[in-house]
Amino acid sequence: LVFSSGGLYGATHLPLALLDKAAGGVKVRHLPTNGGGPAITAILGNNAQCTTQSVSATLPHIKAGKLRPLAVFSATRSKELPDVPTLKELGYDTEYYLWVGIFAPKATPEPVVLTLRDAIKKAAHSDQFRTSLANAGQELAYLDGPDFQKFWDVDGKRTDDAVISIGRVQG
């Protein structure tokens, strides 16, 4: 079984390491490519049999009947793919998220941080932004500073474990 990813230690390689750990050793050959698009092309060209990608990157191919979604790494099912189970539903204790955060320099004055947080929250919850996300097959998972820090701490540990399990990096 050949697994394609967007590259070594990348956002689409790490989930395989997490699944490997949760499944107790998945026997696959890794085919790193130069990005998500080439990883999907590897599947479409029958050079690989599986990949991990975002819903938005694969949705057009799923709708065209060229790819079959098997599971999602999130804790809940995707709104775009409600019939596709989570890995946890299938008995694998693992989660993985592709996310985007907004950061400021550590020395940024608190009033500026609060102004930025308020503006970002307002923009993130706007109808225009939500519509744009939905059109791209994405879902809003907004977390403000303290909640994002909690997520960051858990996700950072999960990511560290995945990188170490792949090898060549010491814990």
Show where each model-derived region lies.
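Conserved, function-defining micro-sites of small-solute handling proteins
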Residues: 1-171
